[in-house]
């Protein structure tokens, strides 16, 4: 596929399983979940911060295996960064964010925080149980239900003389704002509760503790009730079954794929926005929230104008109005020289200019010709 061409959307494969890590996605949007679980490539770049978080997560897992020490941390850090940057370099959507040290302002801070966490591992496995010969850690352990429809890999299972602790590492924001102040994201709590359920399924005992470890080294306890874990598992499997039945009913009519979407302002973080008919319909009918600084536009190609080298200006017709997209670099947007009059065009992650008469672009902005 030529870079920058968006082909007609297809009905996703029917999902037959769910991971605790993706339960939140299933709750939020069935279409997004189905695309993710089928490994459909995203059409927008991942944030470089997410890429850095992936690196830190891998290092945490290596540390839980005892493969990282303070002495070899720097070399392993460089190796893991290179692995992630190599993946980014192979993607036309993300290669412009390499190297991460330049695209992530907190790169060095996160590196130091990760090193500090590694340095504390010999002292304790969690904030109540000192690490000793009676404790053992099973890193990256795969757990599954009896029917294999619910399964996933937990970051660490810590066995102590008092019982088992289920641990998950989170490198991004773990709290969300509420009327009561900051609270742990419900999707993270549900994820750990489902792992507790799977642990009971496999080993016939419940863990004594569920905990999340953040990139700052904070350990967050998650209290739970066994019945809540069981109910959550049943509800998640029921939602999976319902989604599978919906997708199956659409196989002969792909245009009905819009029924799978659950569009809203949270779509701003979705990599599948360009292809999603439900999101496009929502965006055209609803104003952006106050304070939004990224916008998605759909229109028809009207022409190109020269700007200061090497940039050019793209003109789009949108609902009868002529809109200018400034500062487009043909090297970053290779589809520009393939556009012809009245082609359908989508611009994603554009920034509005100060005079609000045109739009600007940066490394996150993506331009598509829609076929």
Regions from the language model: what does each represent?
Residues 166-168, 311-319:
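Short, acidic/hydrophobic/Gly-rich beta-strand patch recurrent on exposed beta strands
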Residues 317-343:
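Beta-strand/loop nucleic-acid-binding surfaces
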Residues 59-139:
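A non-catalytic, helix-rich entry segment at domain boundaries
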Residues 197-287, 359-371:
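Metal-dependent nuclease catalytic regions and adjoining charged, substrate-binding loops involved
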Residues 287-315, 347:
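Structural detector for short beta-strands of small beta-barrel domains
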Residues 20-70, 272:
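Nuclease catalytic cores
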Residues 299-300, 335-366:
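Flexible glycine-rich surface loops and low-complexity tracts that mediate binding to linear polymers
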Residues 133-233:
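Mg2+/Mn2+-dependent nuclease catalytic core
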């Amino acid at each position: 596929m030529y870079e920058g061409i968006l082909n007609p959307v297809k009905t996703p494969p029917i999902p037959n399983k769910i991971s605790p890590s993706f339960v939140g996605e299933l709750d939020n949007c069935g279409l997004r979940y189905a695309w993710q679980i089928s490994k459909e490539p995203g059409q927008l770049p991942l944030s470089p911060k997410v890429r850095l978080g992936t690196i830190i997560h891998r290092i945490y897992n290596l540390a839980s295996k005892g493969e990282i020490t303070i002495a070899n941390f720097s070399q392993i850090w460089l190796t893991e960064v290179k692995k992630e940057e190599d993946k980014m370099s192979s993607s036309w959507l993300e290669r412009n964010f390499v190297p991460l040290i330049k695209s992530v302002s907190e790169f060095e801070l996160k590196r130091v925080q990760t090193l500090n966490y590694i340095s504390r591992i010999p002292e304790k496995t969690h904030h109540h149980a000192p690490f000793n010969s009676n404790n053992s850690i099973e890193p990256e352990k795969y757990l599954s239900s009896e029917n294999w429809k619910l399964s996933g890999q937990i970051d660490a299972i810590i066995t102590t003389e008092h019982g088992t602790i289920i641990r998950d590492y989170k490198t991004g924001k773990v709290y969300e704002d509420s009327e009561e102040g900051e609270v742990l994201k419900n999707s993270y709590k549900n994820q750990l509760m489902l792992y507790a359920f799977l642990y009971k399924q496999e080993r016939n005992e419940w863990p004594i503790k569920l905990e999340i470890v953040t990139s700052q080294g904070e350990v967050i306890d998650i209290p739970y009730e066994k019945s809540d874990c069981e109910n959550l598992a049943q509800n998640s499997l029921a939602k999976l079954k319902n989604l599978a039945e919906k997708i199956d009913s659409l196989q002969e009519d792909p245009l009905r794929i819009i029924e799978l979407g659950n569009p809203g302002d949270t779509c701003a973080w979705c990599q599948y926005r360009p292809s999603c008919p439900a999101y496009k319909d929502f965006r055209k009918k609803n104003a952006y929230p106050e304070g939004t600084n990224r916008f998605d536009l759909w229109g028809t190609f009207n022409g190109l104008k020269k700007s200061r080298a090497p940039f050019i200006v793209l003109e789009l017709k949108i609902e009868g109005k002529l809109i200018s997209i400034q500062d487009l670099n043909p090297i970053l947007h290779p589809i520009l020289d393939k556009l012809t009059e009245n082609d359908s065009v989508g611009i994603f992650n554009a920034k509005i200019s100060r005079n609000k008469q045109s739009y600007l672009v940066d490394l996150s902005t993506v331009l598509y010709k829609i076929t």
